[in-house]
């Protein structure tokens, strides 16, 4: 078993949505959440997703579920990303509108294909050639006839209100496309990082409600402690502060102070690495399969193995061909 399940990034705009949906599921307000493939798949580990099948498949699954159980229209969600909506999810959106099936579809729009390394998607600021993007996701959805509601992924109260309203409308027979916005933190400018958070020990009741993110943990006294992977929610409305019922968490008054008590001692890497010369005995080709690590893992390990192949001499006397099959 894993020491901990995979997690979305510290400060990810998907996190509050996952927390809200997980809470609704635990209270019995949602009986099924249909997902597809992408960073949103990790919402499963926040108790906020039941299925993950293929790019853009979530709404088609929800549609079939509601057609077979019409009474469940207000008790289920379809969730997918902006990239997979553009990939094939819009077909299901169109089919839902065509068949006049009520319900709620949630598009988590972070403007990038984040799970596989941050490639441009049709919602990115520019295309692969660097040309400015003119595609408008919301306008496209509205052109299909969808009722579109946009809300920030960093606004907990607005998210809760929008979800509650959309589910109530579903019970009344309306199909709502809820677009949750928030740029992938890996694409945010560097100066948006580094907001230091602080907790008021006089107000904190040590309830643990704020500990929803890998950037925050409890110290020896059960007070929230912000570790070195806290991003400050990239200068957006901080999720942990919104989770706190006592208002004990806020950006630190002194942003120049370091919140870490110590820094790890890292060994100094050598300037060069002596490798044994390999000139004989190399097989005619090298084939390595990597499975079960997700898109980003495939990309990372593919690069590592390619570098190792070069170091072993394959760059000089053998052809190196790499194929990465993500997700």
Predicted feature locations:
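A short, basic/flexible loop-to-alpha-helix module at the beginning of a structural domain
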Residues: 269-285
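Phosphate/pyrophosphate-binding active-site segments
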Residues: 1-22, 148-155, 160, 177-181
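Iron-sulfur cluster-binding cysteine motifs and their immediate structural context
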Residues: 205-229, 235-273
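Short glycine-rich or small-residue beta-strand-to-loop segments that form or flank ligand, phosphate
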Residues: 7-8, 78-79, 286-293
